[in-house]
Amino acid sequence: MGKYNLILSEYLSFVYNSQSAVQIPIYYSSNSELEKRCIEFHAKCVDSSKKGLSLKPLFEEYKDVIDNATLLSILSYSYDKYNAVERKLVNYAKGKPLEADLTANEIDYENNKITSELFQSAEEYTDSLMDPAILTSLSSNLNAVMFWLERHSNDVADANKIYKRRLDLFTIVASTINKYGVPRHNEKYRYEYEVMKDKPYYLVTWANSSIEMLMSVFSHEDYLIAKELIILSYSNRSTLAKLVSSPMSILVALIDINGTFITNEELELEFSDKYVKAIVPDQIFDELQEMIDNMRKAGLVDIPRMIQEWLVDCSLEKFTLMSKIYSWSFHVGFRKQKMIDAALDQLKTEYTEDVDGEMYNEYTMLIRDEIVKMLEVPVKHDDHLLRDSELAGLLSMSSASNGESRQLKFGRKTIFSTKKNMHVMDDIAHGRYTPGVIPPVNVDRPIPLGRRDVPGRRTRIIFILPYEYFIAQHAVVEKMLSYAKHTREYAEFYSQSNQLLSYGDVTRFLSSNSMVLYTDVSQWDSSQHNTQPFRKGIIMGLDMLSNMTNDPKVVQTLNLYKQTQINLMDSYVQIPDGNVIKKIQYGAVASGEKQTKAANSIANLALIKTVLSRIANKYSFITKIIRVDGDDNYAVLQFNTDVTKQMVQDVSNDVRYIYSRMNAKVKALVSTVGIEIAKRYIAGGKIFFRAGINLLNNEKRGQSTQWDQAAILYSNYIVNKLRGFETDREFILTKIIQMTSVAITGSLRLFPSERVLTTNSTFKVFDSEDFIIEYGTTNDEVYIQRAFMSLSSQKSGIADEIASSQTFKNYVNKLSDQLLISKNVIVSKGIAVTEKAKLNSYAPVYLEKRRAQISALLTMLQKPVSFKSNKITINDILRDIKPFFITSEANLPIQYRKFMPTLPNNVQYVIQCIGSRTYQIEDSGSKSSISKLISKYSVYKPSIEELYKVISLREQEIQLYLVSLGVPPVDAGTYVGSRIYSQDKYKILESYVYNLLSINYGCYQLFNFNSPDLEKLIRIPFKGKIPAVTFILHLYAKLEIINYAIKNGAWISLFCNYPKSEMIKLWKKMWNITALRSPYTSANFFQD
C-alpha cells in the first residue's frame, strides 16, 4: 500500500506517544476465507489491548492478514489529555518572538494588537476579521509541521537544506505562538474572546498562513521570500500582498518574445517563431522603481532585491522567480475588513463636475446598443424563454439567502430560515407571491449585505437582493450570455474556449508595429460615476427592445427587468456597525444581481471602445482584437509604422488622460510584448497563472464538513501545483489524516486508510498519485466501493417532513403544471428531487444527513458489510475491459515546445509529447439534438443524468417525454424515427462517460485526447459496429497510456482484442452506470 498508510501509522505514534496509547489496524478482504481471519485478528487485538498486552505476537500470528488483506482503518485510543502540542512546541520556540508594529496599517483594527485592546469585552468581540474559516485547528497545523520536522531531522544533503530552512522559519512561528500560548479552538473550530483576549488578534490566521508558506519552501529563494512575508505579515495585515504583487503588471512588458504560440484559424495553438522586442519608455521604468521603493519603505528587503537583480537582463529563464514571488504574495492570507469600511470605500470618491459629458454619453450609447444587439433576435422571435421567464427563474432559483430570516410553516413543522427557495414556497402558499412587483430597495427597505474577501485587495460588498430580482433578471441574462457565448470579445464566456485560446489571441497579433493596451477596471465597476450611465444604458436598451415585439409576455419580462434597474438607481444598504445597523445611501454598482458578470462585461467592453474611439482621433491604427475578461479589458492596436519608445509613452499617457476625463480611477498600461490581468499573465510569449489559493485559511464558512474541506484542501493543492506553487505533499497528506479522522468517544478515534479515501466511492477525498485519477478494478477495491454504495444515500427526517408538507407539494405541482403540457413522471419527479436537494443548504437538514452518514461510516470502517449492490459503476465497466488489453513498450518523442513554464515536469512532459487541448470536452449533453429540441420549446433544462436515463428508454416513452415538455407531436415523432436519435444515444453516452471520468478537471483538461500521437499507440481491431464500445475502449486506452506517462515519464502502447460476444454485454451494461458524488467531485466542481 501507498505512502499514506505509512505516514498515517507514523503520525499516530507521533501524536499519541504515551504509554497508554494503542493503535489497532483493521483489515478487510473480498476473499471470504481471508475475511474471517481479518475478523479474528481484529477481535484478538481489541481483547489484548483491553488487557494491556502487546499486539506484536498477533502481528506475527496473522501475518497472512497483514500481507494479503487491505488496510481499512486504524483505531486509535489514548487516555492522556491533549496538551501535547504545547509540550512539543517548547522545543522549537528557541528564537525571539515577533513584535507587531502597531502603526503598520491605516485602519486601527487592521493592526495586530492584543485582542482586548481592539475589543473591550466579549460582547464587542467578533472573530469575523481573523476567522480562518476552516474546519481544522491551529494546534493540528502545528502538530503537522512538527511531525514533518521530526520525520526529516536526519535527512542528508539537499533534503537536509530543506529541513534547515523550514526549521528556521518554524522557529519564528513557534517562538511567537509560545510567547502567548497556543489558542484553543472550540468545537466549531472558532477562537473565542476568552482564548484570544490576551493574545494578538491576528495570531491564528497569521500562524496558519505562515505554516502554509514554510511548508512550501524548497529552494533558498523560497526561503527568503517566505521569511520576509512571514515576518512582515505579522504586522502588515492590509497592503503587503498588494505591494509585493504590483510590479508584475509592468514586468510582463519587459521581456522580448522569442518564439511563442498563437491561435490559428482552426482555434488551435500553433508555434510561431516570431521575435518581438519589448519597447519600454523610461517613464515605465520610473513607475516600476517607485513600486520597488514602496516595497522597501514597507520593510521588504530580499524581494525588491530579487526584482532589481532580474531587471539587469530581464531574462525569461529567471522570470520563474518573479512569477513565484507573484504567487507567494497571496499566501499571506485574506484581508478581512469591517463591512462599514468595505462599503464606505466606494463612497469616498468625490464627484467632479469636470467630466467629459460626451464620453459618458458615448459610453451609455454603446451599452444600450450592445444590450439591443444581444437581445434583438430572441425578442423579435418572441423567444419562449422570454415569455416564460418567471417559470425559468423559479426552476433555477438558488437556495442562497434572501436577506432576512422568516418563520415558515411546513405542515406541522415551524422553521426559521433565510433561504430563497423556502421563502418562495411560503409566499406562494400564503398568496404573498407577486413576481410582477419588484420590491424597492430604498431607505425603507435597505439591502442586507454579504462580503467577498480576497488576498491583496480590499473587502468587497455583495448585495443580497430579494428573490424577485433574480426571477426578473434570470431569463434575460441567460439570453445575454448565450449571445456572449459566440462573441469572441467576451473572453470569459466565449464558447468552450479556455485560457489557452485567449493567450494565443493576444500573442497572435503582437509584432514590431503593434502594441497592446491592458486595463484593470475593477475600480471603475464599483465607482459611483459608473452607476447612472451604466443603469441608464441598460434601461434605454430595454426600452428600444420593448418596441420590437407585440407579445405582452415578452414586454412584461423586459419591463420587470427595467424595474430592477430603476429600483437599484436608488439603493440603500444596511450595515451593522457595532450594535447599530446603519442605513447608507449606496450610489454604486455591487455584485449580487444575476446580471453582475454579464452586465459588467458589457460595460467594460463599452468603456474600452469609448477610449479607443478617442485615441483614434489622434493616431492611425487598426484594432486587431478587443477582449474583456471580468474586471480587465485589453486590446491589440496595429500601427502603420514600427512602434517606438516615444509612441508607447504618448499612447500610454493619452489613454490615461482619457480615462481620467471620465473620472475612472483605473490602472491602464501599454506594452508591446505582454499583459497582466487578474486571471492570467503573458510574459516572454509564455502564459502564466497565479498560484494563489490559500490552503489553511478560507474566505468564508460554508456548510461543508471536515471531509469536504479535506477534499477541497487537496484540490487547492493540486491547482496551485499545476500553477507552480508546490506545498509539501507529506504535509497535505498529514492534514488529510487529521481532517478525515472520526471521533467515536473522547479517547477513541478512527482513521480511514488510503484505500477508503482514494477509491471512487461517495467518500473519496484525494488521489494516491497526484494528477492521476485511478479507478480501482481489483477485487478488494470493487468490494469496498460496493460496501460504500450501500450506505451512500442518507435520509433526513426534516427534509422528508418538509417535502411531504402541502406547501412543498403545492409548489412542486405549480412548477410541473406550468411546465408540462401533459403529465410526465420523469420530469415531475426530477423537479421534486431538485427542489428537495435545495433543502440541503438548510443547515439542520444537512447536519442530519451528515450524522447519519458518519455513523454508517463508523460501522463500515470497523467492519465492511459485504453488500451485493446491483448498481454498476464506471469501475465495473473498466474492470470488464482491462483483461483484454496487452501492454508493450513504446516511444514518443518530445515535439511541442513549452508554453506554460509553471507546470510540474511530469505534466509538462506529457503535453510536450501529445500536445495541449484548447477546448472543453462537452460533458453536459447540451450539444445533443434532443437537448436542443427541448430548449427550443421549453424552459426546462434536463441534466446529463436525466438525458442519459431518457435516451435509453423505449422510443414511445421518449416521444411522450418530449411531447409533455411542449415539443409538437410531429417534431417528437420525426426525432424518434430519424437517424439523429441513434446518434444522440451515442453522443449522450459519450458526454456521460466524460463527465464520470472528470475529463475536464485537474491536469486532464490540459491534454489533447484526440492527439494523433496518442492514437497511434493504440491498436484495436475493428469488429462489428457498436460505436459506444469502440469509444470506451479507446478512452480507457488513452487514460491508461497518459497515466502511465505521468507516473513514469515513458510511453506504452496498447493492443486490445475485444471478443465480439462480449461487446453486446458491455454495451448493455453501459446504459446502467451509476454516477458517484463524493467530496472529491464536489471539490473539483468547486474549482470551477
Curated annotation (Swiss-Prot):
Catalytic reaction equation(s): RNA(n) + a ribonucleoside 5'-triphosphate = RNA(n+1) + diphosphate
Keyword set includes Nucleotidyltransferase: yes
Cofactor: Mg(2+)
GO biological process: DNA-templated transcription; viral genome replication
Keywords: Magnesium, Nucleotide-binding, Nucleotidyltransferase, RNA-binding, RNA-directed RNA polymerase, Transferase, Viral RNA replication, Virion
Any coiled-coil regions, as ranges: none
Domain (RdRp catalytic) ranges: 501-687
Compartments where located: Virion
Family designation: Belongs to the reoviridae RNA-directed RNA polymerase family.
UniProt protein name: RNA-directed RNA polymerase
Species of provenance: Rotavirus A (strain RVA/Human/United States/Wa/1974/G1P1A[8]) (RV-A)
Lineage: Viruses, Riboviria, Orthornavirae, Duplornaviricota, Resentoviricetes
